[in-house]
UniProtKB/Swiss-Prot annotation:
The gene is AIM23. GO terms for biological process: mitochondrial translational initiation. One of its GO terms (molecular function) is mitochondrial ribosome binding. InterPro entries: AIM23. It comes from the Eukaryota. Residues 326-367 are annotated as: Disordered. One of its GO terms (cellular component) is mitochondrion. Its main location: mitochondrion. It is found in: Mitochondrion. This is Altered inheritance of mitochondria protein 23, mitochondrial.
Length: 367
C-alpha cells in the first residue's frame, strides 16, 4: 500500500504520491512579466523500501487509485517540465542519486541550451536549488529556489545568469541569479561556446594560439583579492592572510583591491576604478587610522616574500596594490636577454653571408 497526501494552502498546493511530488499554483514574484499560475512535475521518487518494511505501515496508507479517482488535480500548462533520472548507484554510495533534466516549452533550441547550462551550474553550486534573486515586487534580494524562479520564464524574452556567488557561515554556496534579455543571454552563450571550441582546436594543434588566448593564459597566474576597509581584525588575520600567503607561495602575481564598497556582481574587477588624485573625500580620523592599520597589515604580508610592490589610488577612496615575485621578473628579463642575443647572432650570420656572396661575385668578374 502506498502513501498519498494532499496539503492545500492559499499560495501553494502539494500532492505527494508514489510517482513523486506535484507542485501546483505557485506564483513567482521574481519575474518582470506577470506569469500565470502553472505547475511542474518533479519526479523525486527514490529507491523503494523493502517489502517487509512496507507491510509494517499498511494500516497508515490509502490506495493510490482511490486518491486518483476522487482527488485528481487539474492539469495546468507550464513553460518547462522538470524531471529526474535515477542514476545507478556507485560502489561507495548507499543510495541512488538523481539528475535533473529540463524540457523547456519556450525559446529556441539555442536559448534552451543556454538556460540549461546556467541551470546545471546553479545546481552544481547549490545542489538543493537554493538561490538569491531580486523580487521585483518589493525590490529586495530574497532567498528563493531555482525551481520557483525558473517557473514561468519565457525564453523568447528573457534568460538568466549567475551574477554572484555568496558563501554562508557553514561554507555553503548560494548563487545570486539575475534575469537578462534573451539576446544578451544568447550572445553570452555563443561567446562561451566559441571560446571552448577555439581552446579545443588550439590544444589539438589544429590552429595557432591567438594573442587573446595567450593573454588569458597569462591572466591565470594573476590572483585578484578583495579587502574591504571595513574588514574585521579576525577576518584579516585569518581568512585574508591565508589567502594572500597561499597565493605568494604558489608564485602568483597579486592584485589586492582595497575598497569600502561591497560589490555583488562577478565583474567587480573590471568595474574597479582608481580615483583621480584630486578626488580625495573626507573621512574621520578614526576611519583613517583604521584604514592605515589595514594597509600596513597587507603591506607587511607582501613584504615577507621577495616581491616588487606598486601602489595606486589613495587611502581616502580606494587602492590597488600590485605584487610581482622578483624571481618571475628576473626570469622574464633573462628570457628577453636571451632573445636579444639570438637576434644579434642571426644578424651577424646574415652579414657574413652577404660578404661571402659579394666576394664570390668579385672573383667571378675578375676571372
Amino acid at each position: 500500500m502506498l502513501l498519498s497526501l494532499v496539503r492545500c494552502s492559499t499560495k501553494r498546493q502539494w500532492a505527494i504520491s508514489s510517482t513523486g511530488i506535484r507542485l501546483l499554483s505557485i506564483s513567482s514574484p521574481f519575474l518582470s512579466t506577470g506569469s500565470s499560475n502553472s505547475d511542474f512535475l518533479m519526479n523525486l521518487s527514490g529507491s523503494t523500501r523493502s517489502s517487509k518494511h512496507n507491510n509494517l505501515h499498511n494500516n497508515d496508507r490509502t490506495p493510490i487509485n482511490k486518491y486518483k479517482s476522487n482527488h485528481g488535480p487539474k492539469k495546468v500548462h507550464s513553460n518547462y517540465q522538470l524531471e529526474t533520472k535515477i542514476q545507478p548507484k556507485k560502489m561507495h554510495q548507499s543510495t541512488k542519486f538523481k539528475k535533473f533534466s529540463i524540457k523547456w516549452t519556450t525559446g529556441s533550441e539555442r536559448a534552451q541550451k543556454a538556460a540549461n547550462e546556467v541551470f546545471q551550474k546553479i545546481l552544481g553550486l547549490s545542489p538543493n536549488g537554493v538561490i538569491k534573486a531580486l523580487n521585483l515586487e518589493t525590490n529586495e534580494i530574497e532567498t528563493s529556489s531555482i525551481f520557483q524562479f525558473a517557473k514561468g520564464i519565457d525564453l523568447d524574452r528573457h534568460g538568466f545568469i549567475i551574477a554572484n556567488v555568496e558563501r554562508t557561515t557553514d561554507h555553503k554556496k548560494i548563487p545570486l541569479v539575475k534575469l537578462i534579455e534573451a539576446r544578451v543571454a544568447l550572445r553570452r552563450y555563443s561567446d562561451k561556446v566559441a571560446d571552448r571550441k577555439q581552446k579545443e582546436l588550439i590544444d589539438l594543434g589544429v590552429i595557432k594560439s591567438s594573442k587573446k588566448y595567450d593573454n588569458e593564459k597569462e591572466k591565470v597566474g594573476i590572483k585578484h583579492i578583495r579587502v574591504s576597509w571595513k574588514i574585521k581584525e579576525t577576518d584579516l588575520a585569518k581568512q585574508k592572510t591565508n589567502e594572500i600567503q597561499s597565493a605568494l607561495k604558489k608564485g602568483h602575481k597579486l592584485c589586492i583591491y582595497l575598497d569600502d564598497k561591497t560589490r555583488t556582481n562577478t565583474d567587480w574587477v573590471d568595474d574597479f576604478t582608481i580615483p583621480a588624485e584630486n578626488s580625495n573625500k573626507k573621512i574621520s580620523k578614526r576611519e583613517k587610522l583604521n584604514r592605515t592599520a589595514i594597509l600596513d597589515a597587507v603591506k607587511s604580508l607582501l613584504e615577507e616574500e621577495d616581491t616588487f610592490l606598486s601602489f595606486e589610488g589613495n587611502i581616502e577612496n580606494r587602492m590597488l596594490i600590485k605584487s610581482t615575485p622578483k624571481t618571475l621578473s628576473t626570469s622574464k628579463n633573462k628570457e628577453a636577454l636571451d632573445e636579444k642575443k639570438v637576434l644579434k647572432e642571426q644578424k651577424k650570420q646574415e652579414r657574413r653571408e652577404k660578404l661571402r656572396l659579394r666576394t664570390e661575385k668579385k672573383q667571378d668578374t675578375v676571372t
